[in-house]
């Protein structure tokens, strides 16, 4: 009986992680294009306490108008952005319920006059063909809302361990076909990189329509689809890069703020993520249970052609594409470490506790 449990769990883990990777790879890859010159595009960067990295984001777009919306920073963000060549503006004070990022994005859009608006985060940077490529794709495909996932750059051990697993888990609940299907209710966007045709953006209310949402990117995509606006979710790891968090404390706060809210805003996706998480966290207990069937278990057994060996290797081999090499040995710690982070996020959301994020309670 235990052997069937071990084999069944191994098969389930392989299947769910294979599905996750396939969901990601089925997102279309952004083609590299020279595009038109000059581009009818304004780049908008909401920024709060980003003095250490805002210049890199601004300088990714030479020759293009860049608006940095300085969201009441307490550091030298505004000075660094101006020095890098950006126009710097400030949003109005937040009203009760408003969130900083969507309000900043909405204010930046008010100052833009171009056909296209490109919203990017301050912790992103892009290769020179990116802007032309994403505009050329949007115009060629006739899609007014294009969002792209970027290459995740990880430096600390916590980032290298936790973030690849977090994305693998995230995509267990994402259907690439559904998010890019105008008739599907499933919506997805990556707020690190959103291109929007300004006339369409304004016609549906833009970020102001989701100004009370902490996960404004998914809320904006859902709002757009409800208004009949087609959304295209893509991959652009070859042209865009991001370092989301700079260590464990930032990861903890970031997912405390976002993780459970994503599950709530996309219930079907959330259910799949929860089931995948339960399956994966069953790995170690069932592995120990399987080893109990052997009178003298040893490490060598985990590499022999046995059911427990298959279970032992199932998450490691299945997560290998997300970790890209030796870092996959960190995956077991991520399976259980991220579970604690997710449970903390759920507790924080359900009890309506605030998260301190960049000096502001959200």
What does each model-found stretch correspond to?
Residues 138, 145-170, 199-202, 207-269, ...:
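Catalytic donor/gating beta->alpha subdomain of glycosyltransferases that bind UDP-sugars
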Residues 52-56, 75-84:
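Acidic helix N-cap motif at the loop->helix transition within catalytic regions
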Residues 273, 277-352:
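Membrane-embedded multi-pass helical conduit in multi-pass membrane proteins
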Residues 70-79, 93:
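A conserved acidic beta->alpha catalytic loop
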Residues 1-37, 163-164, 176:
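N-terminal membrane-anchoring/stem segments of glycan-assembly enzymes
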Residues 117:
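Short aromatic/hydrophobic "clamp" motif used to bind/position activated sugar donors
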Residues 21-31, 50-63:
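Short, well-formed alpha-helical segments that are part of the catalytic scaffolds
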Residues 76, 122-137:
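Acidic donor-binding/catalytic loop of UDP-sugar-dependent glycosyltransferases
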